[in-house]
Amino acid sequence: MGANSIPTDATIDLDEQISQLMQCKPLSEQQVRALCEKAKEILMDESNVQPVKSPVTICGDIHGQFHDLAELFRIGGMCPDTNYLFMGDYVDRGYYSVETVTLLVALKMRYPQRITILRGNHESRQITQVYGFYDECLRKYGNANVWKIFTDLFDYFPLTALVESEIFCLHGGLSPSIETLDNIRNFDRVQEVPHEGPMCDLLWSDPDDRCGWGISPRGAGYTFGQDISEQFNHTNNLKLIARAHQLVMDGYNWAHEQKVVTIFSAPNYCYRCGNMASILEVDDCRNHTFIQFEPAPRRGEPDVTRRTPDYFL
């Protein structure tokens, strides 16, 4: 459906829901269920390496920081005027995971060609039960149904994206089991994120200053050196790997002689880290511009009701 298509009852309903969500007001359980059932049909048709055209704005972790997502849209432009590619970790840690992920899924439904939403390591049943999304769903809906609806939907999110055959985008990093993009295209991704193996690595690995493959301190995925990213980019005719997954104080960080960039889009992460956030604008000519931003003003934010583990990875 084009951005300027004739309104139907479905798009009018979606526009109303998006308007409600932009005010940080959650949808009903029934609305979430209907939205996610339809979203599943769209996401099912997308590739494990989803092709994306430029211009596009590439974003990193959001982690339930809804007001900062609204600030991101204010700075970068609202969908569908701006095309977006989000690289995962929409939920956990922040206070508004429900509103954040619902808004992104609603925008995906309304403008499927204008927004791409990849899976992060937090789009998982196991992780969300520890780091906040499960508890938030219980608090806001009185039961775990919405958590189950979303975690079932997460299984359908694409794992990676490819911007104009040049920029490879994913949440985490590379895998010793993956040499080519075709290796990724051949996965069955519709499952909970495994504890090990190539699908796990794509969502958990990190670039490192040391050459070769290393054991990750996270307990999942690997670290990979410049030699690995150079070989992967050469084999697959890529110019850049864009990824998220790590807090970087300036909102973005180059690695491996500008073969890899980390983008992090949650400013003052966990409401205490003091970092900037950034987004990466890629224009029609594939030129890159980083836009940094600070936290949005927050009003009436709740206190954290229960201490969550200090897992800053």
From Swiss-Prot:
Reversibly methyl esterified on Leu-313 by leucine carboxyl methyltransferase 1 (LCMT1) and pectin methylesterase 1 (PME1). Carboxyl methylation influences the affinity of the catalytic subunit for the different regulatory subunits, thereby modulating the PP2A holoenzyme's substrate specificity, enzyme activity and cellular localization. Its EC number is 3.1.3.16. It is an enzyme of class 3 (hydrolase). SMART domains: PP2Ac (SM00156). GO terms for biological process: primary root development; root development; stem cell differentiation. It is found in: Cytoplasm. Its cofactor is Mn(2+). Keywords: Cytoplasm, Hydrolase, Manganese, Metal-binding, Methylation, Phosphoprotein, Protein phosphatase. It catalyses: O-phospho-L-seryl-[protein] + H2O = L-seryl-[protein] + phosphate; O-phospho-L-threonyl-[protein] + H2O = L-threonyl-[protein] + phosphate. GO terms for cellular component: cytoplasm; cytosol; nucleus. The modification Leucine methyl ester is found at L313. One of its GO terms (molecular function) is metal ion binding. Functions redundantly with PP2A4, and is involved in establishing auxin gradients, apical-basal axis of polarity and root and shoot apical meristem during embryogenesis. May dephosphorylate PIN1 and regulate its subcellular distribution for polar auxin transport. Involved in the regulation of formative cell division in roots by dephosphorylating ACR4 protein kinase. PP2A consists of a common heterodimeric core enzyme, composed of a 36 kDa catalytic subunit (subunit C) and a 65 kDa constant regulatory subunit (subunit A), that associates with a variety of regulatory subunits such as subunits B (the R2/B/PR55/B55, R3/B''/PR72/PR130/PR59 and R5/B'/B56 families). Interacts with ACR4. Interacts with TAP46. Interacts with SIC/RON3. Belongs to the PPP phosphatase family. PP-2A subfamily. This is Serine/threonine-protein phosphatase PP2A-3 catalytic subunit. It comes from Arabidopsis thaliana. The gene is PP2A3.
